[in-house]
Curated annotation (Swiss-Prot):
Keyword Ligase found: no
Name of encoding gene: NOP2A
Residue spans of biased composition, Acidic residues class: 58-103, 111-151, 588-599
Cellular component GO terms, alphabetical: nucleolus
Residues that bind S-adenosyl-L-methionine: A367, A368, A369, P370, G371, G372, K373, E391, D418, D437
Organism for this UniProt entry: Arabidopsis thaliana (Mouse-ear cress)
GO biological process terms held by the UniProt record: cell division; leaf morphogenesis; regulation of cell population proliferation; regulation of ribosome biogenesis; RNA methylation; root morphogenesis; rRNA processing
Biased composition (Basic and acidic residues): 610-648, 659-682
Annotated protein name in UniProt: 25S rRNA (cytosine-C(5))-methyltransferase NOP2A
PANTHER family documented for this protein: 25S RRNA (CYTOSINE-C(5))-METHYLTRANSFERASE NOP2A, NOP2 YEAST -RELATED NOL1/NOP2/FMU SUN DOMAIN-CONTAINING
Single annotated GO MF: S-adenosylmethionine-dependent methyltransferase activity
Composition-biased stretches (Basic residues): 1-12, 649-658
Function description: Involved in ribosomal large subunit assembly, required for normal progression of rRNA processing. S-adenosyl-L-methionine-dependent methyltransferase that probably methylates the C(5) position of cytosine 2268 (m5C2268) in nuclear 25S rRNA. May play a role in the regulation of the cell cycle and the increased nucleolar activity that is associated with the cell proliferation. Seems involved in the regulation of cell proliferation in leaves.
Amino acid sequence: MPALTRNKKKAATKSITPPTKQLTKSKTPPMKPQTSMLKKGAKSQNKPPLKKQKKEVVEEEPLEDYEVTDDSDEDDEVSDGSDEDDISPAVESEEIDESDDGENGSNQLFSDDEEENDEETLGDDFLEGSGDEDEEGSLDADSDADSDDDDIVAKSDAIDRDLAMQKKDAAAELEDFIKQDDVHDEEPEHDAFRLPTEEELEEEARGPPDLPLLKTRIEEIVRALKNFKAFRPKDTTRKACVEQLKADLGSYYGYNSFLIGTLVEMFPPGELMELIEAFEKQRPTSIRTNTLKTRRRDLADVLLNRGVNLDPLSKWSKVGLVIYDSQVPIGATPEYLAGYYMLQGASSFLPVMALAPRENERIVDVAAAPGGKTTYIAALMKNTGLIYANEMKVPRLKSLTANLHRMGVTNTIVCNYDGRELPKVLGQNTVDRVLLDAPCSGTGIISKDESVKITKTMDEIKKFAHLQKQLLLAAIDMVDANSKTGGYIVYSTCSIMVTENEAVIDYALKKRDVKLVTCGLDFGRKGFTRFREHRFQPSLDKTRRFYPHVHNMDGFFVAKLKKMSNVKQSSEEGDDDAVETVEQAEVSSDDDDEAEAIEETEKPSVPVRQPKERKEKKNKEKLAKSKEDKRGKKDKKSKSENVEEPSKPRKQKKKRREWKNEIAQAREEKRIAMREKAKEEK
């Protein structure tokens, strides 16, 4: 008999079990052991696990005809065994045992007669089939577990192999890269970049400047100068690259040769490009809160409500605000007109912060207009003490007085004097602190005034330096070294030129008894202690420089001096000599020899004493005349002396003239030799 599937076996059991249940209920009373056994048999009605169901479904075969015949035979069997006497406890126990042995959960109940008569009974086939399926299921489960373990091991091995391959590839790539670098260092590629020839430069000069070409050439030259050994153009020197860089920067950005040459000497190529690019951009607008009338937080809230986008300036300032954009004119708001804030660059805060004024002090602002620094000093002093706000130019006095009134400053006296005359007006050794924001070339604020690129020359820089030295000496003379709270001078400029900054401070250190002290600013670069052929005092590293590409503010210089005594190191004659040396410095380098010759000719010589000698001779002549009547012989001798004495200065004059001519000839020969050497070097 072919094997039955699970579903068909269930159908067979359904057709057989109902009559048996009815018989047991109607004819025989329920017994406790039987009911318990039936309950155990009922547990076998649970469905087998899904895994086994799927496997059994796969093994199914179509047996529709067999089902029909089986159902009829089984119905006959049930009808034959419908009597209560035929059903015994032994039979029921056997049926329950058969149901317990099979894990497929069949509920069929068969008698012993049916098992003997039918060779191919449903129970035997079902039980045999169920046992085989259990064994197959357990084997399949074990095989699945083993296969999963094998898959995990295989995957882990594959991952390990991939990692090993990646490490090998990375090591090989690194070795190749190192080899390429070594080859590049040994044999640089000269064909990558070359300087233009004279013919190419002439062709470029004929037409308008080719800005893209200039830009790329500037970038290539800067790249080569950063690492000249590796990126050196073929058959070129570093000097040639620097000269070409100066020319290209001047034509591309619009600088004159003097200014761009000075910047090239001050900064390395990479930083030079950052500085020049920063000069092409505007610095952010900043304002200073007037603490005499309001607080920064309150002012910020009011301006935010008016549509002003702002932030605190920085950690180093407690009163500054940065304005990004505004829906209203920032210089015409009601708060501005009421004096709650001052439009002021961030770099202008620094000199006042370095000065650190205290209450009830006497302070001088030598160049006060338009009043940003003066009003800041008054706010820090809380309108106590006394401030002398001096401005030499009359037109600028209007803006100074207007800002003082608007900001509510009441402790300031406005005066109009030349700063060099202030020690005579205010007196020497009479004030506690002096702020000198000296007039300068403005090379640190090119972003505000682009005319500086082409208007400033070496002669103008030297004139500014001469004026700055005189103003600084006057400022030092006004300060009282014995002041209990002060005795400080702050010197600042909006220039980045060494001639206007470190050179001026070095000059003051030599002429007055002062020393440099720290500015009290936590940021900023140290000043130069050496530049070109100049060597300054080591203490100049206490000065501070500020650049737009580093600190995002205008170029600025700040130095703070402490006066040690009220005694001058040099007399007035020394000051005059100092002025003469400055005037000589204004002479060009080609005329240095001529300047030396002029100095020597202008020096006081022996003929200056001639008037005194003549007076003495006249007195002698008078005495001789008075004695002529008494002594005639002596008169003759006196006459002979008078005749001989005038001959001496004449001989001396001849000697001096010859001496001057010889010196002039020697200097001309030196000039000619130096010019010939310069031509040969070129």
